[in-house]
Amino acid sequence: MLENCGSRKLPYLRLDQTEVVPKTIKPGASIRYRLSYTACISQQSPYIPGRLVTKILFKGKAEDIRSDDNYSIETGKWVVDTHIAVPKDANTGAYVLEATLSTKERRLQDYVSFNVER
């Protein structure tokens, strides 16, 4: 069984890997954020309801927030790719992408940075 799901407290979530590509972009371009995770849920249900939220922060202030409040979490290894367009009038500097994948019982959170340069 995947990740020894039977021996874990369920639901189980593990963040496997994240990345932003490219790390430096120009205003008007886009980035790809990849979140890979492993999940184990009870065999009584094919999935559990979850929530996936991404925030783009500049100098600590949220510039953009996206939320999928009906995200289905199933047992397995999963990859979520999010493409984000950076506005043409975006300020130059360091940005932080904050991602949160959560259920009622569990929460994964990730922070990755990227730069906008002219």
Question: Model-found features: residue ranges?
Answer:
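Contiguous segments within soluble domain cores/interaction surfaces
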Residues: 2-84, 94-102, 107-108
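Surface-exposed, short loops/turns at beta-strand junctions within beta-sandwich domains
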Residues: 88-92
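Edge beta-strands of extracellular beta-sandwich domains
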Residues: 109-115
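Repeat-unit-sized solenoid/scaffold elements
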Residues: 69, 117-118
